[in-house]
From Swiss-Prot:
One of its GO terms (cellular component) is proton-transporting ATP synthase complex. Belongs to the ATPase alpha/beta chains family. F-type ATPases have 2 components, CF(1) - the catalytic core - and CF(0) - the membrane proton channel. CF(1) has five subunits: alpha(3), beta(3), gamma(1), delta(1), epsilon(1). CF(0) has four main subunits: a(1), b(1), b'(1) and c(9-12). It is found in: Plastid, Chloroplast thylakoid membrane. It is an enzyme of class 7 (translocase). NCBIfam families: atpD. This is ATP synthase subunit beta, chloroplastic. It comes from Scilla messeniaca (Greek squill).
Length: 495
């Protein structure tokens, strides 16, 4: 469904038209509000409570209607803390769903779930807003052609390619390079696709959000001197926020991304960190609303809620939203309903390995664990598919031989296996790559490697043409020509 942004100045109607109710009950982040007969607000309408608490502090709490209880009562979930609210306080029905600012003015800024800037850089310079609740695009509007989304990152493009308008799960523990990979993708989509990115921080640590913002400023993804030239908008609803805010912040980020896709007709990257927290917040809200819990205590509406978010992330004939979602797996149990429901929507998985990070191979993407539904000959072509399969076979054989090497040493292997190991070690190093956003830390200039160059490089390694080059020459280079040039430099240094 195409976006219809509004350009009104205020979400609250004029005084004469105000629909006023009063708080009847407060249960933590849940409010029951009584309205006059015949003036009930609709489900998902935004309600605003304005007033002063007992010590005279100004209160401004926005809530969202979740249930109509009968007897002129509605139950609403607050988007911020309900401290200081009392029974009998006046509640204004805005007559519409929560609306957030959209468009180019959002780039380089940090927002909360309500679309209010929280970066102390003043108000957002836009009057265009859009409601966070919307149905998914109609099937007739979808672009059903399967096409690869080129990232310029060798290991991703070759072994687990992303689908344009697809959904990718990003799995990785702390300190293996998730943030740097996310920033590189934001940088590359801006350079190669002329696209923008939206980052939705859903229920994660405030410190991580702050670190990401600082690193983005340091690497130039957010341009401090000219905010308008930034490549990303940030939307945060962190761990300390009420469940209502954490449940809706993903929709706020998605709404901003939809505007870039539908109105600006751009390719958009939408990052959600972490999709599990979206489910977790929904579970809390479900319990607060008194719904009967389902399997493992999750909400009975788990699949519906996940589907309503994921179905809006897609390619239309105007543009695309490609989503990269960090997935936390509780207790490493992949059968838990939250990750299991998420997997049903994913087109590709990018798994980051601590073992590779420890070896200093960055990006630390595990070439054997990462998967993609796009890696089929009819989609990527025979040449790409064959090269990817041969790379995986070589790495798999190397993995099988590692125990023998550890116990007996390389000399005990057959000639063929020794050759396989040598090529696998070159491939492993050639899968590393210097990043643009890491230039400030490493001093090495970043490299964007096109898909054709990537395939050519790995074909040359597999064919044995480069067997004579030292494996160090393949470490942290862009295309294969840089590896051969580096090998010549290493030879020169030895002499």
């Amino acid at each position: 469904m195409r976006i219809n942004p509004t350009t009104s100045d205020s979400t609250v109607s004029t005084l004469e038209e105000k629909n006023l109710g009063r708080i009847a009950q407060i249960i933590g982040p849940v409010l029951d509000v009584v309205f006059p007969p015949g003036k009930m607000p609709n489900i998902y309408n935004a309600l605003v409570v304005k007033g002063r608490d007992t010590v005279g502090q100004q209160i401004n709490v926005t809530c969202e209607v979740q249930q109509l209880l009968g007897n002129n009562r509605v139950r609403a979930v607050a988007m911020s803390a309900t401290d200081g609210l009392t029974r009998g306080m006046e509640v204004i029905d805005t007559g519409a769903a929560l609306s957030v600012p959209v468009g180019g003015a959002t780039l380089g800024r940090i927002f909360n779930v309500l679309g209010e800037p929280v970066d102390n850089l003043g108000p957002v310079d836009t009057r265009t807003t859009s409601p966070i609740h919307r149905s998914a695009p109609a099937f007739i509007q979808l672009d059903t052609k399967l096409s690869i989304f080129e990232t310029g990152i060798k290991v991703v493009d070759l072994l687990a390619p992303y689908r344009r308008g697809g959904k990718i799960g990003l799995f990785g523990g702390a300190g293996v390079g998730k943030t740097v990979l996310i920033m590189e993708l934001i940088n590359n989509i801006a350079k190669a696709h002329g696209g923008v990115s939206v980052f939705g921080g859903v229920g994660e640590r405030t410190r991580e959000g702050n670190d990401l913002y600082m690193e983005m400023k340091e690497s130039g993804v957010i341009n401090e001197k000219n905010i308008a030239e930034s490549k990303v908008a940030l939307v945060y609803g962190q761990m300390n926020e009420p469940p209502g805010a954490r449940m809706r912040v993903g929709l706020t980020a998605l709404t901003m991304a939809e505007y870039f896709r539908d109105v600006n007709e751009q390719d958009v990257l939408l990052f959600i960190d972490n999709i599990f927290r979206f489910v977790q917040a929904g579970s809390e809200v479900s319990a607060l609303l008194g719904r009967m819990p389902s399997a493992v205590g999750y909400q009975p509406t788990l699949s519906t809620e996940m589907g309503s978010l994921q179905e809006r992330i897609t390619s239309t004939k105007e543009g695309s939203i490609t989503s990269i979602q960090a997935v936390y797996v509780p207790a490493d149990d992949l059968t838990d309903p939250a990750p299991a429901t998420t997997f049903a929507h994913l087109d590709a998985t990018t798994v980051l390995s601590r073992g590779l990070a420890a070896k200093g191979i960055y990006p630390a993407v595990d070439p054997l664990d990462s998967t993609s539904t796009m890696l089929q000959p009819r989609i990527v072509g025979e040449e790409h598919y064959e090269t990817a399969q041969r790379v995986k076979q070589t790495l798999q054989r190397y993995k099988e031989l590692q125990d023998i090497i550890a116990i007996l040493g390389l000399d005990e292997l057959s000639e063929e296996d020794r050759l396989t190991v040598a090529r696998a070690r070159k491939i492993e190093r050639f899968l590393s790559q210097p990043f643009f956003v890491a230039e400030v830390f490493t001093g090495s200039p970043g490299k964007y490697v096109g898909l054709a160059e990537t395939i050519r490089g790995f074909q040359l390694i597999l064919s044995g043409e480069l067997d004579g080059l030292p494996e160090q020459a393949f470490y942290l280079v862009g295309n294969i020509d840089e590896a051969t040039a580096k090998a010549m430099n290493l030879e020169g240094e030895k002499k």
